């Protein structure tokens, strides 16, 4: 056998550097890329990245269950989805999660993700551009408030340009690596 030795220190793989790092050497490719919907296939949630409405009647999504409705709200530059449920105890119960990541360019629609510790989950309400309204996220049952759908690495392979999975079998990621 051969024994290969090197005097160079091999570094660990680089983290995501973003498309702007390519701009100087590849300006045409960079300009073309930033004009595509894929350029904004996933990004942090803010007033510019979220396509839906947060005021008036457009901030609500009603379900076939007359005891459940969703409200989208904005507070202090953060955006939330809240399930409002009339319980058996005749009291209003709320479950609210912050929209932290937007997936989808908004050309067709968007769905939203949130962190719970180091795990990533899909929120139950998405935005459909053709109607300009909030809808159930794909595959979510109408009339139920489901906040525990994990977002696995296979989802992120298509819906993010770069994402560091800490556990490929589950929905565990490095939040600072997005």
Give the residues covered by each predicted segment.
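Post-cleavage N-terminal segment of exported redox proteins
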Residues: 1-9
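Flexible gly/pro/ser-rich segments immediately N-terminal to CXXCH heme-c attachment motifs
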Residues: 9-24, 32-49, 141-152, 168-178
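Cys/His-rich metal-chelating microdomains
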Residues: 28-29, 161
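Short secondary-structure junctions and interdomain/linker hinges
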Residues: 40, 44, 57, 61-64, ...
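Short Fe-S-cluster ligation motifs
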Residues: 49-74
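Extended surface/linker regions that mediate inter-domain or inter-protein docking
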Residues: 69-178
